[in-house]
Amino acid sequence: MFKFNEEKGQLKCSFCGKTQDQVRKLVAGPGVYICDECIELCTEIVEEELGTEEEVEFKDVPKPQEIREILNEYVIGQDQAKKSLAVAVYNHYKRINSNSKVDDVELSKSNISLIGPTGSGKTLLAQTLARILNVPFAIADATSLTEAGYVGEDVENILLKLIQAADYDVEKAEKGIIYIDEIDKVARKSENPSITRDVSGEGVQQALLKILEGTVASVPPQGGRKHPHQEFIQIDTTNILFICGGAFDGIEQIIKRRLGQKVIGFGADNKAADLEKEDLLSKVLPEDLLRFGLIPEFIGRLPVIASLEKLDEEALVAILTKPKNALVKQFKKMLELDNVELEFEEEALSEIAKKAIERKTGARGLRSIIEGIMLDVMFELPSRDDIEKCVITGATVTHGEPPRLLLKDGTEVSQDKTSA
């Protein structure tokens, strides 16, 4: 089992072949030996490779303007929110590159709060940022979280989702992005601290404080509740960027009251009342979030506040057609695979946008509307090889009329034949 030099009967390094007399130290393993020189060489190789990986990962963080330009390819509108996010994300990863200290000045982490109506693009913005930076990304729902000791999800399970997104590479996960949705749903029900514990509100905010600020958290590998004698994954949250989003329904009334109070004399209330909801959201301050029900410590962990506008008909039509992965482009590609050209008339796009506004679902509801319109088309057309083009009209959207189908010779299929 031992490796001997046959001539002198000495032990030798299994890697370089030097004898124990030719090296300073020989470390024994199960049936093998390695000398101090080979150990030093291996250490240098490993450190060099790991160092190179680290440099490649965050050496070329896009500049804020570049980040916004890429966001423009996937997300329509919300220019002010994009600008705020681009600066915050750039500063965050610049801080990581500098190891959090520059000339003994410690750089604090700036997590982000996104405030905007349902379907305005909060989740999509966060997802796109993670894609731009090529970092792990996880989405969590704040409504499912409870503080320790109550039935529900522990806040550490948020971190488990990020670790899973990084294929259990903890070091990679420690530089990822977590988007916590519906954060407004864990607001305290009143401005005054409650004597009894608020399981779904203040308690969750308290539980989130540590991981938002930066701590070494113990995460159960299989999720669920912690229990004794269980192994944990240790993860440092110092460099994880947290983006918390919510609709914050009713906060515009709080902002309106604050603006009204600051105007002295006649017309004070009118000035605040005339402001549209989107304008009010753009004027949100930390004190408004405090009155809404977030605790001061929690607001302090989210120093960057970005507000999103409600999407109008024009913006929703643009969302349907302009982004790289726009829904209309996706459905066109689906029918193209069946050798059928798909066309949406302008009136059809406008009616789809109007339906989304009526349902108050914003951009989030666009896919379900189009899926409903396209169901019969996608069911029937794969079985037909005589159709060249399918045209979705305004009447198709509003009254459920069949789309116009054109044959390869240019003639239009009658509606009777289509429904047959």
Swiss-Prot record:
InterPro entries: AAA+_ATPase (IPR003593), ATP-dep_Clp_protease_ClpX (IPR050052), ATPase_AAA_core (IPR003959), Clp_ATPase_C (IPR019489), Clp_protease_ATP-bd_su_ClpX (IPR004487), ClpX_bact (IPR046425), P-loop_NTPase (IPR027417), Znf_CppX_C4 (IPR010603). Residues 1-54 form the ClpX-type ZB domain. One of its GO terms (biological process) is proteolysis involved in protein catabolic process. ATP binds at residues 117-124. GO terms for cellular component: HslUV protease complex. Keywords: ATP-binding, Chaperone, Metal-binding, Nucleotide-binding, Stress response, Zinc. Gene3D superfamilies: 1.10.8.60, ClpX chaperone, C4-type zinc finger domain, P-loop containing nucleotide triphosphate hydrolases. GO terms for molecular function: ATP binding; ATP hydrolysis activity; ATP-dependent protein folding chaperone; protein dimerization activity; unfolded protein binding; zinc ion binding. Zn(2+) binds at residues 13, 16, 35, 38. It holds the Pfam family zf-C4_ClpX. Disruption phenotype: No degradation of trans-translationally tagged-peptides. It comes from the Bacteria. The keyword Metal-binding applies. The keyword rRNA processing does not apply. Induction: By heat shock. Belongs to the ClpX chaperone family. Component of the ClpX-ClpP complex. Forms a hexameric ring that, in the presence of ATP, binds to fourteen ClpP subunits assembled into a disk-like structure with a central cavity, resembling the structure of eukaryotic proteasomes. ATP-dependent specificity component of the Clp protease. It directs the protease to specific substrates. Can perform chaperone functions in the absence of ClpP. Probably the major protease that degrades proteins tagged by trans-translation. This is ATP-dependent Clp protease ATP-binding subunit ClpX.
